[in-house]
């Protein structure tokens, strides 16, 4: 019986695969996000786009949004500095738990423990030195479970080299931007290792802004006595001076306001550490893999976007394991089953230095101080059946349990820190911030997926799939309450997705097309009275495409994009809406219908690549009534990469070639428009050295 390809054999296979510069080799690209083991995209009943190493090196992203703009249905909405919000087959979600809709991972392991997500957590992974970034769109498979509701972003670490190797890339750009990416690795008697260092300084385009960022990745692979080990240590440190929203309708079109920063006092400091070790060995007729891991994070930042600008301090420690046993039951049937577990302890404190003038419900002092102990356990099974040579059927089921043990370290209730009410003497009122009493909350949910891949000949395939996903409430949604609410009676969000696809390669053209329809229930939101409730619904449908056409010997045209509608299903009483406002069928806010990246690539000779990218962002509404909107924008980017010799290379990147005035993110809140203004035309130069 042939054993599945896993462990050290998997690492070797992935290391030997050539990187695809565009979409042309996507069907042959091997990914691990769908099942935790190397698998060609052509075998998966899912929509996965892998941004290859060559693409990452050509883009040399200053912000991860630049690299992922070429993934259909995906928008990493850039804030200031390293900040961002995520959208995959969804609007851009905001709010304390909205990030729970996405499974953000490094080598298949979540960047943060279940229930403790952060909207900016992609900044905590060394994507700048990754082997590739895999994006699965739609609910994940049985190996993911909670949080893989709208999609998965999996950053794959660079493997150790086959022989001693070293590289250094220096980047310079506007506003004092400077970055050094260094890598060194070698082989040992029973394995190999690689050390990656990333240090970046950005002086900031906006006034009184900028950041210093350091990341380290140490990958070590080894094999002894029939056991293979893949391990990774990741460290990160961010010190950021944050610029806030610029207020006023169409402010991004005013040349005198391009560098404006209304919040020069804002900052974000964040330190992270992660380690895992994946041990793989033969076990009976199959292969067993066990991956213990550890995570640590500590953050301080000023909430400049809130009245009173309270200081938030948060962090966590977590440890656990992933496990799986992979066995071929016969020549046509493979089973993957496993047990995952995780423990975490997290904390959050919020303190406001000064009272807000004229607003008695926002007092100075401490608002929150709590700890949460989290336990997460899951059992899963995934079957792959090939009844005919041209037919593959996948089915997966996961049962996941999440438990929170919450400890309030302040007085219970909606009072000041000392227990006195807010308001005026003789007219007491509850304070804005509410602290529940100590409690335990538990959630148990299933996730399942079913898919069919049918080879119809001529290098073409048809794909049909159904998936059910969920996300438990995040701890902040349960315990960081407002407006006198002392119990958040909310349950897990649920999503059902059906999808059909057509993909193939024919002569000089490769393509992937997908159409999906998704329904969500129990959506958690803050209502008009600032209470966390969970009874909203939404509908999502769209078409996604990836096409690569090599129309001449040295020329190729690639396009990735989406046309989608994300709409409210019902009249949820969202915060800020007058009572009785009808929004059923309206577009959700910050949900552009059309997004696209089209790239013309020219390779006149070996080691020379030029790329012109057109990036389209469609119009979107800024609030649920469809009264205020952002018109969208078109950007052009030019990139040139030249290998000078075996040891030296250089590249030039000109972003926003036409100097378009645009907004990276537009919003409407507190009665006015506000924007993160996009940066003007910018020139970046890279000089690279390779051993």
Q: Predicted segment positions?
A:
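Conserved C-terminal beta-signal and adjacent last beta-strands/turns
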Residues: 13, 234, 383, 453, ...
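Extracytoplasmic beta-strand/coil segments of soluble accessory domains associated
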Residues: 65, 69-109
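Short acidic/polar hinge/loop motifs at secondary-structure boundaries
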Residues: 109-137
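Transmembrane beta-barrel wall of Gram-negative outer-membrane proteins
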Residues: 165, 172-201, 206-243, 265-287, ...
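Solvent-exposed loop segments that connect transmembrane elements
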Residues: 243-261, 306-311, 348-367, 405-440, ...
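Membrane-embedded beta-barrel scaffold of Gram-negative outer-membrane proteins
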Residues: 278, 285-303, 455, 461-467, ...
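Gram-negative outer-membrane beta-barrel transporters
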Residues: 328, 386-393, 401-402, 510-520, ...
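Structural signature of Gram-negative outer-membrane beta-barrels, strongest in the C-terminal barrel
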Residues: 328-336, 340-342, 370-518, 550-552, ...
């Amino acid at each position: 019986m042939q054993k599945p390809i896993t462990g050290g054999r998997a690492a070797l296979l992935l290391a030997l695969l050539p990187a695809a510069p565009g979409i042309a080799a996507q069907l042959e690209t091997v990914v691990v996000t769908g099942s935790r083991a190397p698998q060609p995209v052509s075998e998966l009943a899912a929509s996965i786009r892998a941004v290859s190493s060559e693409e990452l090196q050509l883009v040399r992203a200053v912000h991860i949004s630049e690299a992922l703009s070429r993934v259909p249905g995906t928008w990493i909405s850039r804030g200031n500095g390293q900040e961002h919000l995520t959208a995959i087959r969804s609007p851009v979600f905001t709010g304390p738990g909205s990030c729970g809709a996405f499974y953000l991972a490094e080598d298949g392991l979540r960047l943060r423990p279940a229930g403790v997500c952060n909207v900016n957590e992609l900044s905590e992974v060394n994507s700048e030195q990754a082997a590739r970034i895999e994006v699965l769109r739609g609910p994940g498979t049985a190996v993911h479970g909670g949080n893989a509701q709208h999609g998965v972003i999996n950053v794959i670490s660079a493997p150790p080299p086959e022989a001693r190797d070293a590289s250094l890339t220096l980047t310079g750009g506007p506003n004092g931007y400077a970055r050094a990416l260094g890598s060194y690795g070698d082989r040992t008697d029973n394995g190999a290792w690689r050390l990656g260092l990333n240090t970046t300084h950005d002086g900031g385009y906006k006034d009184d802004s900028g950041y210093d960022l350091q990341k380290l990745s140490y990958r070590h692979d080894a094999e002894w006595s029939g056991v293979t080990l893949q391990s990774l240590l990741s460290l990160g440190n961010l010190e950021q001076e944050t610029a806030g929203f610029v207020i006023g309708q169409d402010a991004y079109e005013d040349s005198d306001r391009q560098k404006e920063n209304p919040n020069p006092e804002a900052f974000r400091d964040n330190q992270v550490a992660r380690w895992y070790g994946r041990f793989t060995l033969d076990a009976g007729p199959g292969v067993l893999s066990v991956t213990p891991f550890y995570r640590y994070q500590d953050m301080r930042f000023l909430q400049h976007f809130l009245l009173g600008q309270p200081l938030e301090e948060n962090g966590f420690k977590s440890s656990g394991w992933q496990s799986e046993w992979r066995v071929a039951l016969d020549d046509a049937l493979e089973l993957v089953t496993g047990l995952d577990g995780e423990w975490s302890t997290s904390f959050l404190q919020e303190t406001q230095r000064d009272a807000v003038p004229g607003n008695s419900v926002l007092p100075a002092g401490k608002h929150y101080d709590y700890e949460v102990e989290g336990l997460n356990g899951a059992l899963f099974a995934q079957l792959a059946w090939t009844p005919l040579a041209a037919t593959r059927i996948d089915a997966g089921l996961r049962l996941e349990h999440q438990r929170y043990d919450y400890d309030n370290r302040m007085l219970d209730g909606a009072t000041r820190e000392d227990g006195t009410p807010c308001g005026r003497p003789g007219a007491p009122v509850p304070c804005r911030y509410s602290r529940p009493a100590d409690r335990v909350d538990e959630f148990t949910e299933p996730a399942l997926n079913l898919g069919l891949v049918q080879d119809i000949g001529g290098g073409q395939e048809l794909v049909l799939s159904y998936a059910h996903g969920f996300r438990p409430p995040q701890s902040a949604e349960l315990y960081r309450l407002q407006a006198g609410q002392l119990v958040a009676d909310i349950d897990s969000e649920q999503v059902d997705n059906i999808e059909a696809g057509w993909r193939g390669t024919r002569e000089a053209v490769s393509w992937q097309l997908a159409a999906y329809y998704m329904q969500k229930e129990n959506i958690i939101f803050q209502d008009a009275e600032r209470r966390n409730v969970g009874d909203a619904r939404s509908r999502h449908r769209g078409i996604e495409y990836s096409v690569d056409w090599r129309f001449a010997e040295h020329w190729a045209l690639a396009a990735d994009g989406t046309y989608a509608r994300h709409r409210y299903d019902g009249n949820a009483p969202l915060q800020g809406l007058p009572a009785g406002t009808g929004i059923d069928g309206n577009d959700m806010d910050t949900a552009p219908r059309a997004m696209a990246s089209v790239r013309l690539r020219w390779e006149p000779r070996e080691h020379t690549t030029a790329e012109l990218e057109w990036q389209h962002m469609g119009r979107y509404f800024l609030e649920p009534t469809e009264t205020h909107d952002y018109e969208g924008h078109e950007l052009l980017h030019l990139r040139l990469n030249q290998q000078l010799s075996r040891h030296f290379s250089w590249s030039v990147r000109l972003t926003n070639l036409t100097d378009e005035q645009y907004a990276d993110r537009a919003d409407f809140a507190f009665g006015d428009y506000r924007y993160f203004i996009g940066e003007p035309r910018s020139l970046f130069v890279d000089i690279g050295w390779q051993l």
